[in-house]
């Protein structure tokens, strides 16, 4: 039996409107819903309200006299929770629910991509209209229920997050690139590829220096040893290029401290952890550490060093036996002195004395127990001080004169022929007079000379680019041994305790003046080298350049750019020797070749 609805005309009109908007009806599976009342009670007259019980048990009222709020918008259809019409579906006839059909779960929601809906709060049982703003129609199926009124697209959020991340990473990479500093080769001013042999250099200069120190290449400059070395002319002269490498500080052992191998870093971390655990007491508190470490906890100490077991008399005897022989100069009395001739005599004499100094240092008790790096480091720092204290000692018996060699005795007036030499002469003469007044003994002299050697490089400058000493503890113990020997000599001479303290302080204070004279002399020698007044021999040149690496640039009287502009002439003399040749032959490969 078919019932005729009173609102059929209005339902047909609404159906034509939907078809005009080209909206396809939703197809849903038909679910059987048991009705609690007869059909006649469901379809009621439009003049009175109708009641219908849904499965949720909620009662809904529809007033046909009042124009119902449209569920369908102009541009789309939306079904959402809280809407009575959308909770159970609508048929093509309008607002009345379709018989024996409910909305399945999950619910289906048709909405624009940005669902800009305008919900209105309402009391329970009242229909809620949804006004879709003027947005293009789109459809999306939502699997979760119940659907929310507004839910942003998670794909859009993820995409925007990826865009923000990529943009931030691009900004970060640009910032890192801006922070990176462009470095140039210290030899030829080309772009540097890294930190090689102690300086920033390019691949070409790195490979050239590597070939030069591995092979025995005797480069000869075809001109005057003044060739310009830059990016375009670095291959024109190998001799000047190698000279430039040494001037800027390239050396065979020059490596960055952070470039050590992973195994070395692992062992260092393990050693540091072990030391940290040893420093912790039983209760977890740090043990109190003394300013001067105890001999029982000193690390890297040569416990079996013969020097530490020597008596004071044995130490003095060993130091006296290690003294180098006297060296005669090439002075010709028939030739008058000039700036070039005097500097030539002094540099030649100093170059030959350096060879004997190396042999003397190896015979100083405790010095031979150090590793090769520390031995070279101490000699490079103290070589001019050792030469000066020897000159002062020889000149004690010649007031007003300096005995450079048995056949070369110079006074202050003769030193005036060399620019800047008079000031150094005066300081040397004053120190010699001080030694003469104190009646310095030969045993005290050899002790002071050894103290200068061992104490020169213990406290390096912070601005030094070279590695500091590795066995400082052993050096300190040998210094203490020699100082005790010096005190023993004073006590043996019959001085009282107060006189011993006073004399020891006076002698050690003189060492600071010798250090000052050494710095003045180093500055003078470097100026002579830059002016090309006299040719410098290989070993002397190597020691001069090495001393400048241990000294801050501000200490020297020249700017750091001068080494690259200096005019240097080297003499390949048979009497000149390199430190690598005469120091320790078995480990000579650890030193770079000189020019």
From Swiss-Prot:
Disulfide bonds: none annotated. Residues 311-595 are annotated as: Transactivation AF-2. Residues 564-578 have a biased composition (Low complexity). Pfam families: ESR1_C (PF12743), Hormone_recep (PF00104), Oest_recep (PF02159), zf-C4 (PF00105). The modification Phosphoserine is found at residues 103, 105, 118, 167. One of its GO terms (cellular component) is cytoplasm. PROSITE patterns: NR_LBD, NUCLEAR_REC_DBD_1, NUCLEAR_REC_DBD_2. The modification Phosphotyrosine is found at residue 537. Residues 185-310 are annotated as: Mediates interaction with DNTTIP2. Residues 143-174, 260-285, 554-578 are annotated as: Disordered. The keyword Secreted does not apply. Its main location: nucleus. Residues 311-547 form the NR LBD domain. A lipid is attached at residue 447 (S-palmitoyl cysteine). Residues 35-47 are annotated as: Required for interaction with NCOA1. Residues 154-165 have a biased composition (Basic and acidic residues). PANTHER family: KNIRPS-RELATED PROTEIN-RELATED. Belongs to the nuclear hormone receptor family. NR3 subfamily. Composed of three domains: a modulating N-terminal domain, a DNA-binding domain and a C-terminal ligand-binding domain. The modulating domain, also known as A/B or AF-1 domain has a ligand-independent transactivation function. The C-terminus contains a ligand-dependent transactivation domain, also known as E/F or AF-2 domain which overlaps with the ligand binding domain. AF-1 and AF-2 activate transcription independently and synergistically and act in a promoter- and cell-specific manner. This is Estrogen receptor. It comes from Mesocricetus auratus. The gene is ESR1.
């Amino acid at each position: 039996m078919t019932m005729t609805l009173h609102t059929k005309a209005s339902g047909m009109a609404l159906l034509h409107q939907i078809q005009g908007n080209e909206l396809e009806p939703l197809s849903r599976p038909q679910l059987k819903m048991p009705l609690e009342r007869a059909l006649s009670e469901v379809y009621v007259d439009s003049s009175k309200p109708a009641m219908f019980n849904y499965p949720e048990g909620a009662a809904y009222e529809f007033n046909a006299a009042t124009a119902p709020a449209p569920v369908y918008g102009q541009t789309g259809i939306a079904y959402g929770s809280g809407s009575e019409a959308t909770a159970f579906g609508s048929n093509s006839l309008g607002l009345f629910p379709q018989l024996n059909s409910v909305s399945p779960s999950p619910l289906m929601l048709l909405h624009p991509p940005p669902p800009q809906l305008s919900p209105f709060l309402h009391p329970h049982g009242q229909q809620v209209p949804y006004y879709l703003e003027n947005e293009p129609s789109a459809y999306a199926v939502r699997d979760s229920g119940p659907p929310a009124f507004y839910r942003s697209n998670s794909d859009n959020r993820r995409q925007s997050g990826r865009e923000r991340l990529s943009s931030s990473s691009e900004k970060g990479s640009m910032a890192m690139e801006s922070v990176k500093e462009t470095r140039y080769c210290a030899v030829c001013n080309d772009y540097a590829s890294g930190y090689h042999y102690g300086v920033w250099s390019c691949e070409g200069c790195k490979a050239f220096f590597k070939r030069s120190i591995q092979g025995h290449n005797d480069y000869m400059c075809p001109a005057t040893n003044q060739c310009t070395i830059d990016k375009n002319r670095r291959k024109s002269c190998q001799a000047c290029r190698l000279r430039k490498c040494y001037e800027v500080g390239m050396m065979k052992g020059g490596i960055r401290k952070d470039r050590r191998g992973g195994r070395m870093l692992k062992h260092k971390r393990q050693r540091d952890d072990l030391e940290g655990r040893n420093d912790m007491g039983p209760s977890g508190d740090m043990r109190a550490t003394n300013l001067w470490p105890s001999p029982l906890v000193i690390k890297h100490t040569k416990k079996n060093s013969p020097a530490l077991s020597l008596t004071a008399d044995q130490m003095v005897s060993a130091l006296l036996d290690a003294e180098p022989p006297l060296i005669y100069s090439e002075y010709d009395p028939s030739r008058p002195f000039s700036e070039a001739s005097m500097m030539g005599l002094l540099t030649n004499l100093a170059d030959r004395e350096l060879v004997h100094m190396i042999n003397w240092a190896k015979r100083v008790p405790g010095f031979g127990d150090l590793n090769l790096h520390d031995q070279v480091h101490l000699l490079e720092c103290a070589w001019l001080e050792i030469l000066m204290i020897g000159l002062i000692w020889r000149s004690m018996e010649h007031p007003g004169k300096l005995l450079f060699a048995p056949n070369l005795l110079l006074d202050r007036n003769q030193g005036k022929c060399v620019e800047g030499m008079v000031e150094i002469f005066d300081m040397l003469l004053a120190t010699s007079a001080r030694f003469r007044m104190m009646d310095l003994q030969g045993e005290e002299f050899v002790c002071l000379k050894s103290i200068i050697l061992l104490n020169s490089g213990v406290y390096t400058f912070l601005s030094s680019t070279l590695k500091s000493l590795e066995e400082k503890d052993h050096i300190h113990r040998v210094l203490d041994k020699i100082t005790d020997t010096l005190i023993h000599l004073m006590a043996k001479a019959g001085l009282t305790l107060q006189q011993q303290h006073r004399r020891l302080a006076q002698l050690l204070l003189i060492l600071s003046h010798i250090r000052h004279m050494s710095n003045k002399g180093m500055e003078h020698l470097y100026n002579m080298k830059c002016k090309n007044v006299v040719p410098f021999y290989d070993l002397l040149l190597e020691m001069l350049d090495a001393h400048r690496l241990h000294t801050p640039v501000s200490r020297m009287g020249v700017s750091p750019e001068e080494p690259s502009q200096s005019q240097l002439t080297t003499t390949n003399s048979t009497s000149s020797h390199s430190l690598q040749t005469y120091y320790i032959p078995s480990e000579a490969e650890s030193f770079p070749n000189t020019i």
